[in-house]
From Swiss-Prot:
Organism of derivation: Barbarea verna (Land cress)
Designated name of the protein: NAD(P)H-quinone oxidoreductase subunit J, chloroplastic
EC number: 7.1.1.-
GO BP terms in the entry: photosynthesis, light reaction
NCBIfam families xrefs: PRK12494.1 (NF009141)
């Protein structure tokens, strides 16, 4: 079942895939990485000018990585806000997604956190560097296939 935004995008020939609705009834769309920067600008101009959150996750060990954007459009008042969830999947071998920092400035720290924890490179991000882990940290700690270097359990310390 397609939502109103999916229908609107399809009428304009914008490539996307509807993933249905989440448990709150929020429409979820999949956008290809190569289309994300242009569709982000279109969504902003259409009224989705508030980025509620951006996060990322590891879909499966050895599988894809996903960057998730929750956008809000407030046209008829706060009580009638329209929300959409955008998912951009990328291969873990070369995880690159265009940064939307230039569209929504609030993605600054959020894209940096996704880079720091999962290794997704956000192209054209002005300050893409580690934000939580030290610069010397090796690897991406939230990937499902991550093996912590020199890791031991607390019980092994005694």
């Amino acid at each position: 079942m397609q939502g109103t935004l999916s229908v609107w995008l399809a009428k304009r020939g914008l490539v996307h895939r509807s993933l249905g609705f989440d448990y709150q009834g929020i429409e979820t769309l999949q956008i290809k990485p190569e289309d994300w920067d242009s569709i982000a600008v279109i969504l902003y101009v259409y009224g989705y000018n508030y980025l509620r959150s951006q996060c990322a996750y590891d879909v499966a060990p050895g599988g894809l990585l996903a960057s998730v954007y929750h956008l809000t459009r407030i046209e008829y008042g706060v009580n009638q806000a329209e929300e959409v969830c955008i998912k951009v999947f990328t291969h873990r071998s070369n995880p690159r997604i265009p940064s939307v920092f230039w569209v929504w400035k609030s993605t600054d720290f959020q894209e940096r956190e996704s880079y720091d924890m999962l290794g997704i490179t956000y192209d054209s991000h002005p300050r893409l560097k580690r934000i939580l882990m030290p610069e010397s940290w090796i690897g991406w700690p939230l990937r499902k296939d991550y093996i912590a270097p020199n890791f031991y359990e607390i019980q092994d310390a005694y």
